[in-house]
């Protein structure tokens, strides 16, 4: 007995037919293509329009062109690179700033643009305040000033780059 039945909810007949045919999910991925269960044909069909979307999860294994501990740079096609942060809470620190600079270097030479975006739950929590706090507590003021300068220089590079750099929060 399923959850709906336990709560005295009626389950559609076609759901039982689907389960009887051995199909246990409304959605699946076959050969990298996302599919949905179609009631009329009683089979999976490709989700329409998905060729117009870029799903980073589909590119992670094959399209990485550069990576460090804080971010990855993917070729997303059409001469465009994508920078995806993967630091804790997608915070911005030295590694993510290095990735932004590296992606701009590559794009200005061999590509047409850069997108900074991800498909994580949170786009970015902002600056790595833990790192900033530790520098302040340790009284590493020169290093703190260098970190702030690196951030500012990188943001100016994003703004004035020779190629478009788009930040795409969600």
What are the functions of these language-model segments?
Residues 1-121, 129-163, 169-170:
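N-terminal glycine-rich phosphate-binding loop for ADP-containing cofactors
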């Amino acid at each position: 007995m399923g959850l709906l039945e336990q709560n005295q909810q009626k389950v559609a007949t076609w759901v039982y037919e689907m389960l009887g045919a051995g199909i246990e999910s409304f959605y699946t991925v076959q050969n990298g293509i996302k599919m949905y269960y179609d009631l009329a044909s009683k089979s999976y069909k490709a989700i329409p329009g998905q060729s117009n979307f870029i799903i980073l999860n589909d590119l992670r294994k094959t399209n990485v062109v550069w990576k460090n501990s804080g971010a990855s740079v993917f070729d997303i096609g059409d001469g465009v690179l994508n920078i995806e942060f993967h630091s804790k809470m997608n915070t911005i620190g030295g590694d993510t700033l290095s990735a932004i600079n590296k992606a701009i270097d590559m794009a200005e030479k061999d590509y047409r643009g850069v997108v900074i975006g991800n498909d994580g739950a949170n786009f970015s929590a902002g600056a790595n305040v833990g790192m900033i706090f530790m520098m302040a507590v340790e009284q590493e003021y020169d290093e703190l000033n260098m970190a702030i300068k690196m951030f500012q220089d990188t943001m100016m590079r994003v703004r004035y780059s020779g190629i478009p750099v788009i930040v795409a929060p969600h």
